[in-house]
């Protein structure tokens, strides 16, 4: 999860987030190289004493600086389209969960189980225990199996919300009257925190998300006790 004064992105926990981190680093390197080249050319222009007052145009140069950026943008677009396809792909999910946004809490339903659902509210600051995180702890965590594909169905009952967990590379809008879907897969156990990422009213910042990823055997035991 995030820590104070963090500069980079959170550590990746899912294959999708790994791909997003690689794409981010790849694109950032291209931007850095282009920026360095532009700054170098500007510094040469400011320091040189050579001028070309007789030059009216330069067709070759204009052609190069039109075609080359287009090629770079196409390469970046191809990489991003691949990741977009991977994020939309649903491959034989082990479990399906329905998430509904409300002002200002989340409700969850395990659709593969009968009558397994609950609401998840933020724990007020005055009720936090030592070591718990302010504005991020909830009374009911979402328990999910690790290393398994989970399909999330996300919607809202009132206004626009957005269900986001950064370390898993997830951010899906919760829109009233529309059912969006996404998949998640955590490669290691642990607690993963997120928040509503769409301005949804006065208590928008009090809608945390907590996923607890556990081994499959533990999840089966927990679900049997809850049903």
UniProtKB/Swiss-Prot annotation:
GO aspect biological process, one term: ATP synthesis coupled electron transport
PROSITE patterns: COX2, COX2_CUA, COX2_TM
Enzyme class: translocase
Entry binding sites for Cu cation A2: 196, 198, 200, 204
Subcellular location: Mitochondrion inner membrane
EC number assigned by the record: 7.1.1.9
Record Pfam families: COX2, COX2_TM
Reactions catalysed, as given in the entry: 4 Fe(II)-[cytochrome c] + O2 + 8 H(+)(in) = 4 Fe(III)-[cytochrome c] + 2 H2O + 4 H(+)(out)
Similarity comment: family membership: Belongs to the cytochrome c oxidase subunit 2 family.
Primary role: Component of the cytochrome c oxidase, the last enzyme in the mitochondrial electron transport chain which drives oxidative phosphorylation. The respiratory chain contains 3 multisubunit complexes succinate dehydrogenase (complex II, CII), ubiquinol-cytochrome c oxidoreductase (cytochrome b-c1 complex, complex III, CIII) and cytochrome c oxidase (complex IV, CIV), that cooperate to transfer electrons derived from NADH and succinate to molecular oxygen, creating an electrochemical gradient over the inner membrane that drives transmembrane transport and the ATP synthase.
Protein name per Swiss-Prot or TrEMBL: Cytochrome c oxidase subunit 2
Protein source organism: Nyctereutes procyonoides
Lineage of source species: Eukaryota, Metazoa, Chordata, Craniata, Vertebrata
Gene it is expressed from: MT-CO2
């Amino acid at each position: 999860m995030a820590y104070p004064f963090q500069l980079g992105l959170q550590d990746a926990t899912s294959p999708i987030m790994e791909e997003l981190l690689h794409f981010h680093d790849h694109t950032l390197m291209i931007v850095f190289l282009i920026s360095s080249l532009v700054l170098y050319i500007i510094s040469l222009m400011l320091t040189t004493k050579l001028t070309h007052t007789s030059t009216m145009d330069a067709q070759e140069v204009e052609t190069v600086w039109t075609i080359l950026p287009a090629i770079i943008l196409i390469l970046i677009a191809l990489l991003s389209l691949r990741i977009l396809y991977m994020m939309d792909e649903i491959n034989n999910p082990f479990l399906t969960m329905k998430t509904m946004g409300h002002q200002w809490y989340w409700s969850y339903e395990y659709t593969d189980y009968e009558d397994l659902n609950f609401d998840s509210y933020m724990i007020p600051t005055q009720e936090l225990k030592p070591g718990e995180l302010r504005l991020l702890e909830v009374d009911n965590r979402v328990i999910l199996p690790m290393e398994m594909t989970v399909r999330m169905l996300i919607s809202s009952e009132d206004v626009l919300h957005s269900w986001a967990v950064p370390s898993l590379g997830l951010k899906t809008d919760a829109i009233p009257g529309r059912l969006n879907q996404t998949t998640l897969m955590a490669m290691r156990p642990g607690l993963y925190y997120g928040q509503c990422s769409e301005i949804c009213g006065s208590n928008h910042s009090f809608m945390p998300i907590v996923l607890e990823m556990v081994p499959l055997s533990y999840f089966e035991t927990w679900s049997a006790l809850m049903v």
